[in-house]
Amino acid sequence: MRSWSAPKVPKLPGSGLPLRLYDTATREVRETEPSGKARMYVCGITPYDATHLGHANTYLAFDLVNRAWRDAGHDVHYTQNTTDVDDPLLERAQAIGVDWRELADREIELFRTDMEALRILPPRDYVAVTEVIDDIAEVIVRLMERGATYRIGDDVYFSVAAAPKFGAISGYDEETMRRLFAERGGDPGRAGKRNPLDWLLWRGERPGEPSWESPFGRGRPGWHVECTAIALRHLGPGFDVSGGGSDLIFPHHEMGACEGHVATGEWPFARAYVHAGMVAYEGEKMSKSRGNLVFVSELRHEADPMAIRLALLARHYRSDWEWTPDRLTEAEARLARWRAAVARPAGPDGAALLARVRERIADDLDAPGALALIDAWAAADGDDASAPGLVRDMVDALLGVAL
C-alpha cells in the first residue's frame, strides 16, 4: 500500500549519540543497539475515523526514534500496518451506511494527509491487513503445527498454555490481564475456551462479514496475529523496537510477542517494547469510543501544523497528559520565538547547542529538555554567524519542526 511523501531531512555535522529508550519488557531505560540497519515496527490505526491527537502523539514519538537513529548513521527499516478489517470498522461502516472498504480507504487517505502535515517520516512498508491475508494464514499454520492452537467451531484460538513467555512483556498479574483483555476486544468469558486469556487467531466466516479462504476455512484474522505476521514478513524476528501507545502493552503486544516466539522459536520477538503515553481531553483518555476527540485534520486548519507538533513535543512521550487549547497557544508562541531567532544574522554557539540537544534526544527522547535548551538559545545573544542556519537544520532534522 502507498505510504505518504517524505519531507527532506537536513544532514547535520557530526553524528548522533546511541539512543536509549525505556523498554516496557525489562522496565528500564537501556541502549538500543541496532546492528547497522535499525528495524522498527509501529502498530497503525484502525481506519474508521479521523486521526486524533492521541494517534499523532504516538506516531510523533516514533518519528523521533526514526530521526535519532538516522542522525546516528543507521539505515532505518520502519514498518507500520493499518488494520483495514476489524470489528470497529465493520460496525462503523454499517452504522453510517457505507461499504467498509470505502470507509477504510477514505480514512487511510486522511491519515496520510495528517502525517504529511505533521512531517512524520513515512514507513518504508505501509501494509494493509487485507493485503497480507495469506501471510497471516501461514503464521497460523505454523502455530497449529507446533500444537499451540485449538478450535471452537470455525474459530481458531491460541492456547496460552503453549506460550512459556506469556506475561514477560507487561508483567501484569492474571486479574489485571483478564480485566484489560475484556476491555480491549478480548472474550475471556466465551464458552469452550480452555483458558479465559486464550485469544482469537482466526474468526470463521459470519453472515454479512468479509472473509477469505484459508487452510482452516473461510474467515478473517484476529487482531494480534495480523501485526505478528506483518512484522515477520518485513523485519524478521528480533527487530529492534516494537512500538505503539501504552494501551497496546496488553493484550496486543503481549500476545503478538508470544505468537512470534512460538512460530519462530526465537526470543525476544522484538528487542525492546516502547510505548507512548495516553492523551486525555475533558478529563478522560482521548478515544473514539468516548467521543472526546480532537482531530488533527480540523486542528491543522486552525493552526500551523508545526505548532501542533511543538505542542506534542512539549510533553515527554511516555507521559499521560491532557490536551487543552492553552497548550496550542503556548506552542504557537514558541514557534514564533524560534522562527525569529533563526532569522537573526547571528546567535549563540550553534555547535554547542547541537551537542546538548543530541544528548537530550538520546536520553529516552527527552524532547521537553531539548525544547528548553532551544528556548534558552533563542532568548540569548551571540556572534556565531553560522548558528541560525545550523539551529534551523537541527530543529528540522531531530525534532521535525520546519522553521
From Swiss-Prot:
The keyword Metal-binding applies. Keywords: ATP-binding, Ligase, Metal-binding, Nucleotide-binding, Zinc. A motif ('KMSKS' region) lies at residues 285-289. Belongs to the class-I aminoacyl-tRNA synthetase family. MshC subfamily. Pfam families: tRNA-synt_1e. The gene is mshC. Binds 1 zinc ion per subunit. Its EC number is 6.3.1.13. Zn(2+) binds at C43, C227, H252. Monomer. It catalyses: 1D-myo-inositol 2-amino-2-deoxy-alpha-D-glucopyranoside + L-cysteine + ATP = 1D-myo-inositol 2-(L-cysteinylamino)-2-deoxy-alpha-D-glucopyranoside + AMP + diphosphate + H(+). GO terms for molecular function: ATP binding; cysteine-glucosaminylinositol ligase activity; cysteine-tRNA ligase activity; zinc ion binding. Catalyzes the ATP-dependent condensation of GlcN-Ins and L-cysteine to form L-Cys-GlcN-Ins. A motif ('HIGH' region) lies at residues 45-55. It comes from Thermobispora bispora (strain ATCC 19993 / DSM 43833 / CBS 139.67 / JCM 10125 / KCTC 9307 / NBRC 14880 / R51). One of its GO terms (biological process) is mycothiol biosynthetic process. This is L-cysteine:1D-myo-inositol 2-amino-2-deoxy-alpha-D-glucopyranoside ligase. A motif ('ERGGDP' region) lies at residues 183-188. One of its GO terms (cellular component) is cytosol. Its cofactor is Zn(2+). L-cysteinyl-5'-AMP binds at C43, G44, I45, T46, T58, N81, T82, T83, W223, G245, S246, D247, V279.
